[in-house]
Amino acid sequence: MSFHDLHHQGVPFVLPNAWDVPSALAYLAEGFTAIGTTSFGVSSSGGHPDGHRATRGANIALAAALAPLQCYVSVDIEDGYSDEPDAIADYVAQLSTAGINIEDSSAEKLIDPALAAAKIVAIKQRNPEVFVNARVDTYWLRQHADTTSTIQRALRYVDAGADGVFVPLANDPDELAELTRNIPCPVNTLPVPGLTIADLGELGVARVSTGSVPYSAGLYAAAHAARAVSDGEQLPRSVPYAELQARLVDYENRTSTT
């Protein structure tokens, strides 16, 4: 089954988002066959805020590090780190991944949808096999956060060649159903509080990305593990050291032969 096919199964597939090799290996150990990256996790772990075009080089390095894994990889490239469509297309070619996420906002503001569409056109012309997931940030930024504006933007991106549309924080079931009815390609969401994967499937959602939830949960768990040690409390569950080490040894052996 191709990465494109995963979006047409009739039920949503879950795409966990990694920020480094160990997180990706953890997802593989759980049986996931496709892994995305989280721009927040990558930027945050490097000491940078999200969305500030600070992870261009880090994403190239991460894509290369994940390439030997037996799974599909999709990379979140924020807004493409540029306003020049051809430069973004060249950047995507360097990643050599099954898919990418590109958002229609920059510096926490929506950009002209014509520019966002031009970026998609350039990416698909240069990389026709790459699954382009066009992120519409209307709900995320609470700017023009309504179905009409969101659908208008989404249709421009589909016409430009987008293979999927990502609408983070579009959490109202009725609005989600309207979006999936009117956007003629697979629609991607983040987890929606109170709705199961099956519920989202009934609303027409094709893909559910974990986003930065696992990264944030990891930070929470790390802080509370340290507090448990300090307070003399029972330590939380964790992956055994030996298992983590074995994963990394296997990864190192695999990469040394590629």
UniProtKB/Swiss-Prot annotation:
Domain of life of the native organism: Bacteria
Q: Which Pfam families match?
A: PEP_mutase (PF13714)
What sections of the sequence does the record tag as coiled-coil?
Answer: none
Q: Name one GO molecular function term.
A: catalytic activity
Q: SUPFAM superfamilies under this entry?
A: Phosphoenolpyruvate/pyruvate domain (SSF51621)
InterPro entries per the UniProt record, alphabetical: ICL/PEPM, Pyrv/PenolPyrv_kinase-like_dom, Pyrv_kinase-like_dom_sf
Question: What triggers its expression?
Answer: A member of the dormancy regulon. Induced in response to reduced oxygen tension (hypoxia) and low levels of nitric oxide (NO).
Record-linked PANTHER family: CARBOXYPHOSPHONOENOLPYRUVATE PHOSPHONOMUTASE-LIKE PROTEIN (AFU_ORTHOLOGUE AFUA_5G07230), PHOSPHOENOLPYRUVATE CARBOXYLASE
> What protein is this chain from?
Uncharacterized protein MT2054
Look up and give the organism this protein is from: Mycobacterium tuberculosis (strain CDC 1551 / Oshkosh)
